[in-house]
Amino acid sequence: MPDDLSGWQPPRPDAGARVWGAAASTPGHDVREARVGQRAPQPSPGPAVGAAGPGDRGRPGRWRRASGAARLGSAYVGLIVVAALVAVGGLAATPRYGEGTAWGGTTVDDLRRAPGATSWSVDLAAALAPAVPRGCLHLWPSEAVDGLVAVGSSVDLDVGSPVDGTGCRDAAAADPSSRVALVDVAAGRVVWVHDLAREVAGTDPLSIPSSQVVPSAGRVLVQTQTTGSTVLVALDLADGSVLESTRGRRDLPSVSVATSGRLQLRTSTALGDSGGRYSLVDAGDLDHPVWEGRADVGTAPLLLPDGLVVVRSERARRVDGRTGQERPFGAAPDVVAVSPTDPGTVYALGRRLGGARTVSALDRSGEAAWSAPTGSRGFAVTPRCVVTTGRLDTAATCLDRRDGSTAWTTDLGGAFSVEAVPGQVGDDVYAVVQRDGDAALAALSGDDGHVRFRTPVGQLDTVVAASRTVVYLGTDDARSFPRGVTAFDAATGAELWTYRSPGTVSFWGGALVSIDDRGVARRLVDDTAVGRTS
């Protein structure tokens, strides 16, 4: 295991904090809160108890002359005042975390300590390519859906691997299999393994497979390369058997795929073709696309969970993902986004039909519920806001998702990126800000935009997930498969821990999973508590 798995230790408090920590060990107070280095409020100087202040002349010794009942009453009042001060101080020192449901519907493990244990391990290399030297193998997990992940493999000819390219090539020739495994993330169990080479002729073990788990269609879709063309295979979610397959055209060798829910947007490009050919495919019927067509030069269709938006003849159309029917769409966007809490509304950034650049919220009919002018080139939909950029891309502006009104604007002092964070609880907006060669993670309050914290991070770090009390950043330049994850406190920005893997580490839904350089996957956990995974 890496050397950096020890639990996060807070800085040693100074003398004042140590005194407060010792006093806080009395019953009714959590001493762990005192150890974060916060200093308790110190009483202001004043006359000593029983001393005569300026307003007490002529009444010396009043405390001494009081009756026993009066002294007892004064003591009770003093205790009440002290208790109130402790309560107020405790509230001020207690971090505030978000409440409510997880953004995107995925509850992410709340790992406040470095993951020093594993709840399961699966030898994926042995399941997918037992005859291939492990140094030659690369594993490709899909996005997790309903707690399931499909994992494909390819033989890597990288000469920097422990096995040279010739040895890897020989292994691929000796074992031309192309296997896919379905993994149950909660149980850490391989549900099934299927070798595509049994039904699909000409599969290439060097090809990088792309998988999609589609529980609503009862299928796992796998695209891989064969001799001369691509092939898309539908496997049964229950047992991995082949349900159907379809081959791409040999004259359209380049195929890229975007996925959303049970829909795929497939782009095919021929040599010398000035524009792509597009098809919208439902996972339940690969041979009969819902829609096929082209887009204006310089534009591309944009996929939605229930269809797509395409611009043809300078007119934007929304295509229904079930019927393929088209209807007018009130914007010609460069970017679209949908909130998981309101899938019926499409947020679009781009050119309105009149020519002005706007960000808009459009309903299913394609009519704009609201529209706001913007100079932004990018945006993100967060729990409370549609966040856009402005003023040379250093200011974040929150547009209220309900009506498009400006809720707040905060200048972050540098270029930044904002993304909706899977699993986050609460309305904070997380941004990675770049300035003068340095980067910082900034948390902005969803209420008014004030910066709740700002903490240094790596220039290539990206926010990959969040839980109720933790924000997780991928800490490597390989965005899809980061080699490290760093955890930060969601209320204070304090760094909690960093985990680095010799292979890859990423979130499979709400579970943090590492795949080492031997092809063994492990779910990383804090052995004191693990949150529920969706």
Task: Please give the residue ranges for each predicted region.
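N-terminal "mature head" segments of proteins
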Residues: 43-213, 328, 518-534
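A short beta-strand motif characteristic of beta-propeller blades
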Residues: 118-133, 189-202, 241-247, 287-294, ...
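Repeated scaffold domains used in trafficking and secretory/extracellular systems
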Residues: 131-144, 196-215, 248-262, 294-307, ...
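Short beta-strand elements that form the blades of beta-propeller/WD-repeat-like
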Residues: 146-173, 212-227, 260-272, 301-312, ...
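Structural motif
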Residues: 170-179, 228-233, 272-279, 314-319, ...
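Short loop/turn segments that connect beta-strands within beta-propeller blades
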Residues: 185-187, 236-239, 283-286, 320-324, ...
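Solenoidal tandem-repeat scaffolds enriched in leucines and small polar residues
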Residues: 250-378, 386-387
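Blade-level signature of beta-propeller repeat domains, shared across WD40, Kelch, NHL, RCC1
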Residues: 493-534
